[in-house]
Amino acid sequence: MQRNSVEGDRFSSMTDEQLVALCHEGEDLIPVIVSRYAYVVKSKAYAMRVDFSEREDMMQEGFLGLLSAVRAFNPQKNVSFSTYANKCIFN
């Protein structure tokens, strides 16, 4: 647990695009990105006003969408990672 805290501090000044680029180079920074986007995933799931088990499923799908966004993000498409990730989270 402390390791993630240290990593979070180490990478806190980096942009999402920089973190994703490092992921593409083989760095395991998924926990840092998930930590940054957890609020987005959870707030979108809670906005759906469904029961607890469905909300949990939606959050799981949202995090899978986020992971997909990390894998597929292409900075040459001239769109920010944040915009791309938000589209992937619940689409």
Question: Language model features by range: what are they?
Answer:
Residues M1-N91:
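Alpha-helical promoter-recognition and RNA polymerase-docking modules of transcription initiation factors
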